[in-house]
Amino acid sequence: MAQSAANIDESWIGTNAEQVFGQHTGCPVFVTNDADAAGMAEMRYGVGKGEEGVVMLITIGTGLGTALFYKGMMIPNTELGHLLWPHGKSAEAYASSGARERLKISRKEWAERFNGYLLHLERLFSPDLFILGGGESKFFEQYKS
């Protein structure tokens, strides 16, 4: 059941997407959010393959998506971009790529904000591995200097 619609039309809220797509395609369908799907791919084929500890994938784009794994098993729908930040808004309203664009802040200032988000997640979950992806990941080379 679609519970939110951050990047799709709001008419999907309350829709059993698995049933709709399954009926139209005649195939079994599994629906998940983009961060969980990316996390499953990374754990099976990417840098998370074989990792047994706590692994967290973060998609950095319009918002902040998360996927959390422990001993190779996904803990679904973590939605950690919705954690409340000290200013009373969500972390993604403060530290996402969308926030950087909306607030017109420099990549340096954004990186400091995002680093604060990573430190917060590290305190909460002590992950053995962070995997960063999403639209902002194409700019990671710029953050090395």
What are the functions of these language-model segments?
Residues M1, D36-G39, G65-T66, S137-F140:
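Short, active-site-adjacent cap segments at secondary-structure transitions
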Residues M1-E52, S145:
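Glycine-rich phosphate-binding loop and adjoining helix at the ATP-binding site
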Residues N33, I60-T62, G134-E136:
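Short secondary-structure boundary segments
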Residues V55-T59, I131:
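Short glycine-aspartate micro-motif
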Residues I58, L64-F69:
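Short beta-strand scaffold segments in enzyme catalytic cores
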Residues F69-E101:
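Histidine/lysine/aspartate-rich catalytic loop segments that bind and position anionic ligands
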Residues K89-S145:
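Adenine-nucleotide phosphate-binding core of ATP-dependent small-molecule kinases
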